[in-house]
Amino acid sequence: MKVVTLKDIPNVPMEGAERIEGYTGPVSRSRQTIIQPGDSANYNCSVVNFSQRCTTGWHTHNCDQVLVVTSGSGMVANEHEQREINAGDVVHIKAGERHWHGAKADSTMGHITITAFGSQATHG
């Protein structure tokens, strides 16, 4: 068993930050790895933190993805709908579903992401 406190996990900058439509300023996102590579045969689990107006851009996963919003407010969208998400919300995205998620224009957002170990994301 392992217990971690989110504030104690290093925040590592990530590439691939996308702007919300119509915004041209800087955006950033970072990752706090909860389950270290090799510590689980089944899951990847991290916190991803988004600056205001930052999204993942469109992508798919070859496994289901679960998001647990830990702070702030954001949006999640697929090709059919866009929904606001807030701290405490949980999102289930099916394998192969084209989607994006990120912070709103007026808020940062953090979420825990859970995917299958060895799974892949494809952007675009």
Question: Could you tell me what each predicted segment is?
Answer:
Residues 63-74, 79:
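Glycine- and acidic-residue-biased ligand/ion/polar-headgroup-sensing regions
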Residues 80-96:
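Short acidic-glycine-tyrosine-enriched beta hairpin
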Residues 92, 106-124:
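A short hydrophobic beta-strand segment most commonly corresponding to one strand
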Residues 1-42, 122-124:
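A short, N-terminal "cap"/entry segment at the start of jelly-roll beta-barrel domains
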Residues 44-61, 95:
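Conserved short histidine dyad/triad with adjacent acidic residue
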Residues 56-58, 76-77, 98-105:
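Short beta-strand His + acidic residue motifs that chelate non-heme Fe in jelly-roll/DSBH
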